[in-house]
Amino acid sequence: LGLKVLGDMQKIFQTRHPVIIYPASGTGAWEAALSNTLSPGDHILMFETGQFASLWNKLATRLGLKTELLSWQGTDEHLPNAPGWRRGVQADLIHARLLADKNHEIKAVCVVHNETSTGVTSNIAAVRKAIDDAKHPALLMVDTISGLASAEFEHDKWGIDVSISGSQKGLMLPPGISFNAVSPRAIEASKTAKLPRSFWAWDEMLEINKTGYFP
């Protein structure tokens, strides 16, 4: 049964690579994604599209990461204090920022696919293209907690390194289960990442998952 569930989750994420399952909320899967791939003080680029993008940024800061939060460039008469909360990610801003990062200090780009608080959906394929066009090695991490199984999502095709999701939205299951879909690049990064982790550690989970069981 365990192997079937893991295989079926790969189909939902549209990936040939591992999907890790946690008994946790989506917040736990956020932390798992960051702690398995990054080290204290690493610089990450995030984009404010709503409440959950802001909360993910807050969590990353608490983990000891250096976060840089980009915001939508423009005005909104309905939300003058938070105009980006009614707009998706601007891939051109990510492209420009990565081009300026000549020393490749930015280790990851973190964006929300579908912002639960507003319903705004971002073009993840465009974000991947922005990273590639800038010839930047940053990992791409995507929160698709309310997007998975609700809107088109292609982990492999869109070149995502870590996709984060949960059970209670598009999958229409009880809350309390969350997921990391991980690329080979993400797994390789986890071998040198220095952020502390125990419960969230991918290595032991992946090893035992090969048998269809969990630690």
Language model region names:
Residues 52-54, 75-77, 147-149, 169-173, ...:
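Short gly/pro/ser/thr-enriched loop/turn and capping motifs at secondary-structure boundaries
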Residues 168-215:
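Active-site C-terminal subdomain of aminotransferase-like
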Residues 1-32, 51, 55-61:
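Conserved N-terminal alpha-helix of the aminotransferase class I/II PLP-enzyme fold
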Residues 28, 38-105:
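PLP-dependent aminotransferase-like
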Residues 156-168:
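Conserved active-site segment immediately N-terminal to the catalytic lysine
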